């Protein structure tokens, strides 16, 4: 719904760094990029950001995107400390939005 007061956190994971995006009512609340080397670093930055924004780990939804799956220790650790963790299936998004990566770049 358009008027959802709930803040949602999206984390886009690459090797060595990740971005945290927080949105509320379809508006960007925060965008930040962090370097990490261990699952503990990764979790620390997520929890630190949540705390700065007054987000309760028992409540806010966390969507993980990118280089991660349910078997990953990064996912496992996040899941242990944050109640609402899910993996966002990007292929699903691409299908729904008809994103095309076959555009001719030449």
Specify the residue positions occupied by each region the protein language model found.
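Hydrophobic/aromatic-enriched cytosolic interaction surfaces used to assemble or bind macromolecules
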Residues: 1-106
């Amino acid at each position: 719904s358009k008027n959802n007061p709930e803040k949602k956190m999206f984390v886009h994971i690459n090797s060595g760094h990740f971005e945290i995006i927080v949105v509320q009512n379809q508006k960007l609340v925060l965008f930040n990029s962090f370097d990490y080397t261990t699952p503990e670093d990764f979790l620390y930055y997520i929890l630190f950001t949540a705390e700065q924004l007054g987000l309760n780990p028992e409540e806010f939804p966390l969507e993980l995107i990118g280089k991660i799956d349910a078997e990953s220790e990064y996912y496992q650790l996040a899941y242990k400390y944050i109640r609402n963790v899910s993996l966002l299936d990007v292929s699903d998004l691409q299908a729904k939005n008809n994103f095309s990566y076959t555009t001719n770049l030449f």
